[in-house]
Protein backbone atom coordinates (compact mmCIF):
# COMPACT_ATOMS: atom_id res chain seq x y z
CA UNK A 1 0.00 0.00 0.00
CA UNK A 2 2.86 2.41 0.71
CA UNK A 3 4.17 2.42 -2.84
CA UNK A 4 0.71 3.39 -4.16
CA UNK A 5 0.57 6.56 -2.05
CA UNK A 6 1.60 9.94 -3.50
CA UNK A 7 5.28 10.67 -2.92
CA UNK A 8 6.25 13.20 -0.27
CA UNK A 9 9.64 14.69 0.70
CA UNK A 10 9.55 13.22 4.23
CA UNK A 11 9.54 9.59 3.06
CA UNK A 12 13.28 9.06 3.38
CA UNK A 13 13.36 10.89 6.70
CA UNK A 14 12.91 7.73 8.75
CA UNK A 15 15.05 5.58 11.02
CA UNK A 16 14.59 2.41 8.99
CA UNK A 17 17.65 0.98 7.30
CA UNK A 18 16.33 -2.59 7.01
CA UNK A 19 12.98 -4.30 6.86
CA UNK A 20 11.80 -7.88 7.16
CA UNK A 21 8.57 -9.17 5.70
CA UNK A 22 6.89 -10.88 2.81
CA UNK A 23 4.94 -10.09 -0.29
CA UNK A 24 7.02 -7.38 -1.95
CA UNK A 25 6.68 -8.01 -5.67
CA UNK A 26 9.91 -8.05 -7.71
CA UNK A 27 8.60 -5.35 -10.08
CA UNK A 28 8.44 -2.75 -7.27
CA UNK A 29 11.46 -3.92 -5.22
CA UNK A 30 14.00 -1.36 -6.52
CA UNK A 31 11.51 1.50 -6.42
CA UNK A 32 10.57 0.67 -2.82
CA UNK A 33 14.20 0.54 -1.65
CA UNK A 34 15.07 3.81 -3.37
CA UNK A 35 11.92 5.73 -2.46
CA UNK A 36 12.02 4.92 1.25
CA UNK A 37 15.81 4.74 1.68
CA UNK A 38 15.92 1.09 2.73
CA UNK A 39 19.35 -0.56 2.47
CA UNK A 40 18.52 -4.11 3.49
CA UNK A 41 15.32 -5.99 2.72
CA UNK A 42 14.85 -9.55 3.93
CA UNK A 43 11.92 -11.52 2.58
CA UNK A 44 10.38 -14.78 3.66
CA UNK A 45 7.78 -17.03 2.10
CA UNK A 46 5.50 -19.62 3.64
CA UNK A 47 1.95 -20.41 4.59
CA UNK A 48 0.33 -21.55 7.80
CA UNK A 49 -0.78 -24.86 6.32
CA UNK A 50 2.20 -25.40 4.03
CA UNK A 51 5.20 -27.62 4.60
CA UNK A 52 7.78 -25.45 2.86
CA UNK A 53 9.30 -22.05 3.51
CA UNK A 54 11.97 -19.74 2.13
CA UNK A 55 14.18 -17.05 3.64
CA UNK A 56 16.19 -14.29 1.99
CA UNK A 57 18.64 -13.50 4.78
CA UNK A 58 21.46 -12.58 2.38
CA UNK A 59 19.84 -9.36 1.11
CA UNK A 60 19.63 -10.62 -2.47
CA UNK A 61 17.36 -8.29 -4.42
CA UNK A 62 13.98 -9.44 -5.69
CA UNK A 63 14.13 -12.89 -4.11
CA UNK A 64 12.33 -14.82 -1.41
CA UNK A 65 15.63 -16.60 -0.85
CA UNK A 66 16.60 -20.18 -0.22
CA UNK A 67 14.59 -23.18 0.90
CA UNK A 68 15.75 -25.73 3.42
CA UNK A 69 12.96 -28.11 2.42
CA UNK A 70 12.28 -30.16 -0.65
CA UNK A 71 11.07 -27.63 -3.25
CA UNK A 72 10.12 -28.51 -6.80
CA UNK A 73 8.87 -26.26 -9.60
CA UNK A 74 6.78 -27.99 -12.25
CA UNK A 75 5.66 -26.60 -15.60
CA UNK A 76 2.31 -24.85 -15.44
CA UNK A 77 -0.01 -23.52 -18.14
CA UNK A 78 -1.21 -20.16 -16.84
CA UNK A 79 -3.73 -19.64 -19.66
CA UNK A 80 -5.51 -22.94 -19.03
CA UNK A 81 -4.82 -22.97 -15.26
CA UNK A 82 -3.37 -26.48 -15.24
CA UNK A 83 -0.18 -28.45 -14.74
CA UNK A 84 1.65 -29.45 -17.93
CA UNK A 85 2.45 -33.15 -18.27
CA UNK A 86 4.69 -34.98 -20.71
CA UNK A 87 3.35 -37.49 -23.26
CA UNK A 88 3.48 -40.24 -20.62
CA UNK A 89 1.42 -38.20 -18.15
CA UNK A 90 4.37 -37.34 -15.90
CA UNK A 91 5.09 -33.98 -14.30
CA UNK A 92 7.73 -31.84 -16.06
CA UNK A 93 10.22 -29.89 -13.99
CA UNK A 94 10.39 -26.17 -14.87
CA UNK A 95 13.62 -24.92 -16.45
CA UNK A 96 15.90 -22.47 -14.62
CA UNK A 97 14.35 -19.00 -14.87
CA UNK A 98 10.98 -20.36 -16.02
CA UNK A 99 7.97 -19.83 -13.75
CA UNK A 100 6.68 -23.10 -12.34
CA UNK A 101 4.14 -24.28 -9.81
CA UNK A 102 5.80 -24.69 -6.41
CA UNK A 103 5.41 -28.08 -4.78
CA UNK A 104 6.73 -29.02 -1.35
CA UNK A 105 7.80 -32.63 -0.87
CA UNK A 106 5.85 -34.34 1.91
CA UNK A 107 7.79 -36.78 4.08
CA UNK A 108 8.50 -37.47 7.76
CA UNK A 109 10.54 -34.27 8.07
CA UNK A 110 8.32 -31.95 6.00
CA UNK A 111 4.80 -33.01 6.87
CA UNK A 112 1.47 -31.70 5.71
CA UNK A 113 -1.04 -31.97 8.54
CA UNK A 114 -3.96 -30.97 6.34
CA UNK A 115 -7.12 -29.03 6.94
CA UNK A 116 -10.15 -29.87 9.06
CA UNK A 117 -11.85 -30.93 5.80
CA UNK A 118 -10.28 -34.15 4.50
CA UNK A 119 -11.48 -33.52 0.93
CA UNK A 120 -9.78 -30.10 0.89
CA UNK A 121 -6.59 -31.70 2.25
CA UNK A 122 -6.62 -34.39 -0.43
CA UNK A 123 -6.97 -31.77 -3.18
CA UNK A 124 -3.74 -30.06 -2.04
CA UNK A 125 -1.61 -33.21 -2.29
CA UNK A 126 -0.23 -34.36 -5.64
CA UNK A 127 1.03 -37.92 -5.85
CA UNK A 128 3.57 -39.78 -7.99
CA UNK A 129 5.25 -36.54 -9.03
CA UNK A 130 8.87 -37.72 -9.19
CA UNK A 131 8.46 -41.35 -8.26
CA UNK A 132 5.73 -43.85 -7.52
CA UNK A 133 4.22 -43.32 -4.07
CA UNK A 134 5.62 -39.86 -3.34
CA UNK A 135 3.47 -36.94 -2.16
CA UNK A 136 3.82 -33.19 -2.77
CA UNK A 137 1.97 -30.21 -1.30
CA UNK A 138 0.57 -27.92 -4.00
CA UNK A 139 1.20 -24.36 -2.77
CA UNK A 140 -0.83 -22.71 -5.52
CA UNK A 141 2.05 -20.30 -6.18
CA UNK A 142 4.25 -19.75 -9.20
CA UNK A 143 7.93 -19.21 -8.48
CA UNK A 144 11.10 -19.26 -10.55
CA UNK A 145 14.75 -19.91 -9.80
CA UNK A 146 17.02 -16.92 -10.28
CA UNK A 147 20.76 -16.29 -10.36
CA UNK A 148 21.97 -14.16 -7.45
CA UNK A 149 25.69 -14.63 -7.97
CA UNK A 150 26.95 -16.76 -5.14
CA UNK A 151 24.45 -18.89 -3.24
CA UNK A 152 26.36 -21.78 -1.65
CA UNK A 153 25.05 -23.94 -4.54
CA UNK A 154 21.55 -23.59 -3.10
CA UNK A 155 18.93 -22.25 -5.53
CA UNK A 156 17.33 -18.87 -4.88
CA UNK A 157 13.71 -18.33 -5.80
CA UNK A 158 11.57 -15.40 -6.85
CA UNK A 159 7.83 -15.14 -6.30
CA UNK A 160 5.91 -14.75 -9.57
CA UNK A 161 2.17 -15.00 -8.83
CA UNK A 162 -0.68 -16.93 -7.24
CA UNK A 163 -2.68 -19.23 -9.50
CA UNK A 164 -6.42 -19.51 -9.74
CA UNK A 165 -9.08 -17.12 -8.56
CA UNK A 166 -7.36 -15.20 -5.76
CA UNK A 167 -7.48 -11.70 -4.37
CA UNK A 168 -4.78 -9.38 -5.77
CA UNK A 169 -3.43 -6.42 -3.77
Regions found by a protein language model. Name each.
Residues 69, 73-106:
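Glycine-rich phosphate/pyrophosphate-binding loop
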Residues 37, 43, 80, 135, ...:
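Generic secretory/membrane-interface signal
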Residues 1-77, 91, 111, 115, ...:
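Gly/Ser/Thr-rich phosphate-binding loop
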Residues 26, 56-57, 86, 125-129:
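Short secondary-structure boundary micro-motifs
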Residues 7-10, 79-87, 128-131, 147-152:
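Alpha-helix termini
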Residues 92-169:
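Conserved ATP-binding/catalytic segment of the ANL
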Amino acid sequence: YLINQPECPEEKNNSLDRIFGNGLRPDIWDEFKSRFGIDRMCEFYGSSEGNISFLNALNKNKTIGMCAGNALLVKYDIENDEIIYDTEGKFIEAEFGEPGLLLGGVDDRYQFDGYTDDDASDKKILRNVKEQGDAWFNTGDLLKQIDVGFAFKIPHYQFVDRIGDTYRW
